[in-house]
Structures are given as structure tokens and as C-alpha cells.
Amino acid sequence: MTQTDNPVPNCGLLPEQQYCSADHEEPLLLHEEQLIFPDHSSQLSSADIIEPIKMNSSTESIIGTTLRKKWVPLSSTQITALSGAFAGFLSGVAVCPLDVAKTRLQAQGLQTRFENPYYRGIMGTLSTIVRDEGPRGLYKGLVPIVLGYFPTWMIYFSVYEFSKKFFHGIFPQFDFVAQSCAAITAGAASTTLTNPIWVVKTRLMLQSNLGEHPTHYKGTFDAFRKLFYQEGFKALYAGLVPSLLGLFHVAIHFPIYEDLKVRFHCYSRENNTNSINLQRLIMASSVSKMIASAVTYPHEILRTRMQLKSDIPDSIQRRLFPLIKATYAQEGLKGFYSGFTTNLVRTIPASAITLVSFEYFRNRLENISTMVI
């Protein structure tokens, strides 16, 4: 076949796999891997016409687009990490006011400033904060929340998905055990790495604009600086032990959530893409969170109180077992569930926002990553 720079007029790419040769005015019909001229008995392989096709820019564009490989911009690990970061950010911003209220209620039991309960109930706590500090008081600790949730959930979901595959190999017949082990592993990694951020968040949420706290922090980075220089590196890891004990929470929460996702048929397959049922995911995340919170809430009380300022005279707040004893002696069993109702109001929507948005972002990114450009 003779190569030419100017194809015969009206001989371009034709529909139904028809092509035109520069030497023949009649179209060439492409049958699988061969080209057959209608008026010739000779047959040419597709390789014989590659160069003529390349001379036609329009043809090159069409074929290049058709044969282009699937574009996969993100790996599975990257998709999981980004989805977790986005989900944590949305959750933190949405429930920050309730988080402030919960922290105040948890802390007031042993603090001298709160010998007579200063905050009462959910709405009472929120209204008291607004009255004393203005609406901005509801968003104290927002910066460390934003800084904290990004790495926390990014680390958590990444480690969880990896560990889930690992432990399923060890416990192939016991999904609950494998998922619990994966949740504990992920929780330990994220909690240990981000604990300093949550210490700062707790300090900022507890201080008042009135400046009555023993140390007044001007902001997130000022709190980090004062914590490190005035109290030492150990202060950044205050409350880590009860936080690690709180891993029993995720060991209960995530296996139940995984099971409910299947039972509620939260995922379906449509048009070669995965689709999610948001209402069913919300139900699965809410029910699983409620069960886990009821079982493991006392550790949050202990963690919050251990993270308080340590320069209160004769403070016992940095030692776990003396703190448990003092809490029980002064407040009884109900002291371990101080702010529990507020916590449920906060954590159930927070869990729903985090898990549902994680599933949504992951599903969208996975579908986009498998699209043909």
C-alpha cells in the first residue's frame, strides 16, 4: 500500500468499522484482525494500514481515545486515606459545639472550679457557654479538631483496611475477631500518634474567656508551646493510657457496624458501579455506635480528667487508679457516666457523618478511578 499525505476526498473514518485507503476510493471493511477490499482477493493485516491511519489526525485522535488505558489516579490505600481525612474533617466541624459541651460536663466532676455543678444538661451547657463566652465559645478547640481529625481518620482507616485483610488471613472463620483485632490495631496507631493534638483540644475547650483557668492559652500553637515548656513532653501524652483502654470501644463498634452493613444491604451494584444507600448506612452506624458507647463510656471520663491542668494542688489526675477511686468516692457510679446523654447526642451524629461520608467518598473515588477517559 502506498503511503500518502493527502487522503482521497470524502474518504475519512466511516461508521461501522469502515476505513478508507489512500489508494482506493472504495471503503475498506474491518473484519476482526483483517482488512478485506471488496473488489480485491488480497487480504492485508491491520499492521499494514497503521501508518496511513496515523497520517490522518482525526483518525488518530479517535483511535487513540478508544485504545487509551483506564486512568487510575489513586491507589486503594490513597483512596482510603483521603476518604478518612475528608470524613473526619466534616465530622469535627459539624459536632464541635456538642464536643465542647461534652468535655465541660465530663471535666466538672473533680475540678475545684466546678465543685457545685456549673453546667447542667445539654441545652443548659450550651446556653451557659454562649452566655459567658459568646457563640465563639462553642467552637473552642476547632483548630486542633481540624488538625487532629485529618491524620486521625487518615491513619485509622488506612491501618484498619490493611489490618482487616491481615487478620482475616489468621482468623478466616471468625469475622468478628478479625475485625476487632483490626480495629484495635488501627485505633492504637491513630491514638498514639495524635494524642498531643487531643490534649491541646481538651485544654482549649475547658478554658474560659474569663481567664480563670490556671493557664490561659491564646490559641492552638500557644497551647502546644506552653504545654511543652511548662509541663514537659509527658504532658502531651496525658490520658494516653485510658485512651488505649478505650480501644475496646472500636473493637465493639466496627465489627457490629460491618455486620449491620451486610444485614441492612447498604451496598448495591448498578450499571457496573457500586452504589450506597445512605439511609441504611446512617442506621448501621448509629446503632453500632450506641451499643459501643454504652459499654465503654467510662474510659472517656477518665481520659478527659487526666488531660486537665496538673497544677491544681494535690492533683491526682495523672494517675489512673487513684482517679478511678476518687471519682467513685465523690460521685458514685453515675460519675463514670457524667455527660453520657450529651455524648450520645454528639457521637451518634458524629459517627454517622464520619462513616457515611467515608463510605461515600471512597465509593465516589473508586468509581471515578475506574472510569475510561
UniProtKB/Swiss-Prot annotation:
Source organism, top-level taxon: Eukaryota
Catalytic activity: dAMP(in) + NAD(+)(out) = dAMP(out) + NAD(+)(in); dGMP(in) + NAD(+)(out) = dGMP(out) + NAD(+)(in); GMP(in) + NAD(+)(out) = GMP(out) + NAD(+)(in); AMP(in) + NAD(+)(out) = AMP(out) + NAD(+)(in)
Segments passing through the bilayer: 81-101, 142-162, 177-199, 236-256, 281-297, 336-358
Mitochondrial intermembrane side: 102-141, 200-235, 298-335
Membrane topology according to the record: Multi-pass membrane protein
Main location (coarse class): mitochondrion
Cellular compartment(s): Mitochondrion inner membrane
Keywords, in A-Z order: Membrane, Mitochondrion, Mitochondrion inner membrane, Repeat, Transmembrane, Transmembrane helix, Transport
GO cellular component: mitochondrial inner membrane; mitochondrion
Residue ranges annotated as Mitochondrial matrix topological domain: 1-80, 163-176, 257-280, 359-373
Residue ranges of Solcar repeats: 75-166, 174-263, 276-364
Extent of the signal sequence: none
One Gene Ontology MF term: NAD transmembrane transporter activity
GO biological process: mitochondrial NAD transmembrane transport; mitochondrial pyruvate transmembrane transport; NAD transmembrane transport
SUPFAM superfamilies (alphabetical): Mitochondrial carrier
Family under the similarity heading: Belongs to the mitochondrial carrier (TC 2.A.29) family.
Function, in words: Mitochondrial inner membrane carrier protein that mediates the import of NAD(+) into mitochondria. Can transport NAD(+) by unidirectional transport or by exchange with intramitochondrially generated dAMP and dGMP. Also able to transport NAD(+) by exchange with AMP, GMP or deamido-NAD (+) in vitro.
Protein name: Mitochondrial nicotinamide adenine dinucleotide transporter 1
